[in-house]
Design a protein with these regions (language model features):
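Transmembrane beta-barrel wall of Gram-negative outer-membrane proteins
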Residues: 29-104, 115, 122, 176-180
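A surface-exposed, glycine/aromatic-enriched loop/edge motif typical of exported proteins
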Residues: 1-7, 97-151, 208-210, 216-219
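Residues embedded in well-ordered regular secondary structure
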Residues: 1-68, 105-108, 136-152, 164-170, ...
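Small-side-chain secondary-structure face that scaffolds active or pore-lining regions
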Residues: 65-75, 95-108, 168-177, 182-220
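Context-gated lysine
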Residues: 2, 18, 46-49, 79, ...
Length: 220
């Protein structure tokens, strides 16, 4: 059994004028890929009389299972102890954390970015998603499997999943600065006096790039 697909009605598509066979074609594995993580660690330490220090840095980059998604993690640590005088001890500790998530996978029923939800609940099992990887027409509009009509080939309900993956960008950036300092003084009779300072500075940034041609963001 052959049937006319939205792509066969699209003059800009390689499938124009080519009916498709009515068969199961909705393979959600076509939407995803294997994620890869690359981690680098560097550390340095030095210890001599009345002084020791250590510096470490870790950088981790991970590609997500969704196209156009990734994550970055960076950790910096610095710790040192020294005795400026025989009766004084100084300790300094600093930690920095950077975390960025780009297009992290989302769940829930929001109808705007959860591609998996749209295509498991509302997808048509005869749609071959691989045919829609070339989602953009020369004029910038998107091809989709649920058009309004023959003369109006814009999305009626759901956007092309590949368009959502590549045209929508959502970034969250977290930064933490944690530091502490100790100064202690040796007193007679095995007593000690000192002061300790602690600090914690945090930062958060959210960025969203929403495509203007998306039906899913018209009311958002």
């Amino acid at each position: 059994v052959k049937y006319v697909t939205p792509l066969s009605l699209d003059e800009t598509s390689d499938y124009y004028g080519k009916p498709a066979t009515w068969q199961h074609g909705l393979d959600l594995r076509d939407l995803y890929r294997t994620g890869v993580t690359n981690t680098t660690n560097v550390s340095f330490s030095k210890s001599v009389k009345d002084f020791n220090t250590r510096v470490s840095f870790t950088n981790s980059y991970r590609t997500g299972v969704q196209p156009n998604s990734d994550a970055i993690r960076r950790f910096l640590g610095f710790k040192t102890n020294f005795k400026p005088t025989p009766w004084m001890n100084v300790s300094l500790d600093y930690k920095y954390t950077y975390r960025q998530d780009h297009n992290a996978a989302e769940s829930g029923y929001n109808g705007s970015r959860t591609v998996l939800q749209e295509y498991t609940q509302w997808g048509q099992t005869n749609v071959n998603l691989k045919d829609y990887k070339d989602y953009k027409r020369p004029d910038g509009s998107w091809r989709t499997w649920n058009i309004n009509s023959v003369n109006n080939q814009s999305a009626a309900f759901h956007d092309n999943p590949y368009a959502l993956f590549h045209e929508y960008n959502h970034r969250t950036i977290y930064q933490w600065n944690v530091f502490s300092g100790d100064v202690s003084v040796d007193l007679p009779y095995n007593l000690k006096a000192g002061v300790r300072v602690n600090g914690n500075i945090r930062g958060y940034k959210l960025e969203r790039e929403r495509p203007s041609g998306s039906i899913n963001f018209r009311s958002n």
